[in-house]
Amino acid sequence: GKFQRAKPDAYRLMKTLRRGDLLFWEHTYRPVRKPPITHVMVYLGRDPQGRMWMAGSQGSRGVGIYEFRPKMKMGSYPWFLWFRREGKFIGYARP
């Protein structure tokens, strides 16, 4: 499928995402490629309360099911002086 760059707008994503979509983050660790996509999860859908869920791995916790909150930062690495570059959600694709 085609990659769709997306802002971390939960309301808009709730209307757009479908089960099985791939969710992409950049800069969850120091990238060695362009574009700097460093993490992928699979969108599972919404529960009756409207929360969005995804499956994949997060660090050393292994594979699991996690709440998808698009504005939540994921991972980081030292960047410049005392600054850290934080991983952020950047888009999705339909396989």
Which residues fall in each region the model found?
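A short, polar/proline- and glycine-enriched secondary-structure boundary/capping micro-motif
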Residues: 63-71
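Short non-domain terminal segments
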Residues: 1, 22, 66, 78-81, ...
